[in-house]
Amino acid sequence: MENFKHLPEPFRIRVIEPVKRTTRAYREEAIIKSGMNPFLLDSEDVFIDLLTDSGTGAVTQSMQAAMMRGDEAYSGSRSYYALAESVKNIFGYQYTIPTHQGRGAEQIYIPVLIKKREQEKGLDRSKMVAFSNYFFDTTQGHSQINGCTVRNVYIKEAFDTGVRYDFKGNFDLEGLERGIEEVGPNNVPYIVATITSNSAGGQPVSLANLKAMYSIAKKYDIPVVMDSARFAENAYFIKQREAEYKDWTIEQITRETYKYADMLAMSAKKDAMVPMGGLLCMKDDSFFDVYTECRTLCVVQEGFPTYGGLEGGAMERLAVGLYDGMNLDWLAYRIAQVQYLVDGLEEIGVVCQQAGGHAAFVDAGKLLPHIPADQFPAQALACELYKVAGIRAVEIGSFLLGRDPKTGKQLPCPAELLRLTIPRATYTQTHMDFIIEAFKHVKENASNIKGLTFTYEPKVLRHFTAKLKEV
């Protein structure tokens, strides 16, 4: 099989979920009722759901079997200790707090790190800025809710869809250090390393870049949090593209990666393959005070620290899923599936970001050049794709980025992308071919697609619940 051009899915399908086919008229009515926001569509009205890979994929048989071991004790559950042991073995982190999902971890650690910086370094809350290679939307939202400005420092190649570059998710190291000096190191409560960089197109971060970033952070005594939703995909790209690690296992690369952070926050619904779950973990005793404070907040916001909003069976499933998500054959198939979709789209003239780990990212700005950024071309494209084929995708652009919380002005976005997110072990190559064919029809009518404007705009994380209409 080593010389075959295409390999089939490395799994057998045992349980299926029927989906219904709808008419164009039905879909047009549904998208209008949703306020031109695919997030607000009913799932039963979606034929292929590419909204997210977060908790929407299949689980392995070993994960499902592990649920039967669940200890549902309110405190001291043995299922918690199984999960904590997996974290120690995989990441080398000593302290584990389970959460219901990634944003549960964010709402705990962000205020704790801000308070710690204020008490120990005299942080000025009116001047504080957190840095990242690119903040995920909820991380940005929780930072802003806590009064912290966020600044993304990414390399110039990151959003140029005409450029191929191995590690488009990398930090701009000079920009990072320059930014720290500009705002004052004591006013930087944390740095977040997002692997892979979702908003840049699921693009990986190299180990060399993470090492250099961590060195800068240590120079200024700034804590680093690894946003770890797609840690296994990032490790796979390092193995494929960073020569020094080509003979390392995914497990070895993962362990090495986490030397270059102090904490990890994870939506386990991605690479750990679970329908629900998250993690907040600290590396060693140097962050025991943060761990203690976060445990206290966990009780109030998530649940007792040995379950954190998860039932025992879910913790057992997560303890196994962390391992199953690192399977090399599985990762090779998953990355190849994304590449197949990107190649097919580009063959019909649809410009995409280079293939990343979890999704194809269509350059909506180039497909719909007549729609200005403030009329959200990628959101308009998402609505058209649903009308044409019942495919639900998600905008990653100006609509998602939102407004400056201080000025109320739209933040400038480096690219207007439509994310076609592939749930794990859910769709086959035939589905990918259908998506490509759908874009042929969309492309034929591209010049007639209209921009969008708000009828309802929430102040925080607007893309989830906003409503729009055609201009």
Swiss-Prot record:
What species is this protein from? Escherichia coli O157:H7
The gene is tnaA
Q: What name does UniProt use for this protein?
A: Tryptophanase
The enzyme's E.C. designation: 4.1.99.1
Does the record carry Thylakoid as a key word?
no
Task: Please list the residues that carry the modification N6-(pyridoxal phosphate)lysine.
Answer: 270
Q: Which Pfam families match?
A: Beta_elim_lyase
Gene3D superfamilies found in the cross-reference section: Aspartate Aminotransferase, domain 1 (3.90.1150.10), Type I PLP-dependent aspartate aminotransferase-like (Major domain) (3.40.640.10)
Q: Which family, according to UniProt?
A: Belongs to the beta-eliminating lyase family.
- Keywords for the protein's UniProt record, in alphabetical order: Acetylation, Lyase, Pyridoxal phosphate, Tryptophan catabolism
The catalytic activity, as recorded, is:
L-tryptophan + H2O = indole + pyruvate + NH4(+)
Q: Does the keyword Acetylation apply?
A: yes
